[in-house]
Amino acid sequence: MDFLELARKRYSVRAYKPQAVEDQKLAQVLEAVRLAPTAANNQPIRFVVIHTAGREQELRRIYDRDWFVSAPIVICGCGVLAEAYVGKGGRNTAEVDVTIATDHLILAATSLGLGTCWIGAFDPQAAREVLGLPQGVEPMIFTTLGYPADTPEPKERKALEDIVRYETW
């Protein structure tokens, strides 16, 4: 499938089959993370893979949704702030780097028939505690990973001319 077809196929999956994700497919989506670009190639990204079976109650502390804990795998994208490039104005790029790597993961998963869902509204303190994150490692994004048990609804997107400007605003 070409890239635009892949981008159109991706959707936020909120129901998962109990079927396990094969190790080979998990390795492929994690390789996509590894290959993602980062500012100045500093690679301040770390990903924690969590198999949810038997951990549902503690994972609910992070994000209390049935569909979150019903996915066979949940992945947390973390940034190591001290390793990230700091640009002009003091902007630390760790969150941007983690976001790019997570998008690589999500698109790779989609290409393999797996479903995902971005989760940004999680409890960061609970994530630090449940995942045992060391000082200086910040949880930035979660995604579920598994085989979809739902069907995508039509996506509403703004028209291109509403989001793109040429040369100046």
For the regions a language model picked out, list residue spans one by one.
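C-terminal helix-cap and adjacent tail motif
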Residues: F3-V13, K17-A20, K25, I141-W169
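Glycine/small-residue-rich phosphate/adenosyl-binding loop
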Residues: K25-E31, L35-A101
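A glycine-rich helix N-cap at a beta->alpha junction
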Residues: W67-A71, I75, G132-P154
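Short secondary-structure boundary segments
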Residues: G79, A121, Y147
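Acidic, metal-associated active-site segment
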Residues: T102-T110
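Structured binding elements
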Residues: G113
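Active-site helix/loop module of the DD-peptidase/beta-lactamase fold
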Residues: I119-G136
